[in-house]
């Protein structure tokens, strides 16, 4: 099976990164590495003091992203992992920020659990195709979450235990 990378587009990457309120030194989880482009933009914004962990389900895309990130000089600031991103990456949790680049039917509980108090999660939520909305989840210091809609979007589905079936 051949996999095609359908990126969120530069405009959507910028919207998502702005909504993340990235800070120098943040520890960030990206779900859905794709080509590695979005992880590179996040790594650039959080600087060498921060780190991006990106998890991708498709082994071929892990290979593509790794190659692109190495070529662009980000391999020391971005760690790529192959696995079910809908479950997050608990090995390095908690995260200051989490960004999901595929639409989930609901906000996955494992991602909220891996978000540090005071953290922000950006995720497209909705149907396998449409409608979908970009959601900003803010976790307060007591672990309560506040959900804000950032508007309608169109993303590929998040495949996994907490996402959609293949």
Regions found by a protein language model. Name each.
Residues 146-160:
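Conserved histidine-centered catalytic loops in small-molecule metabolism enzymes
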Residues 3-27:
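Conserved alpha-helix/loop element of class I SAM-dependent methyltransferases that forms part
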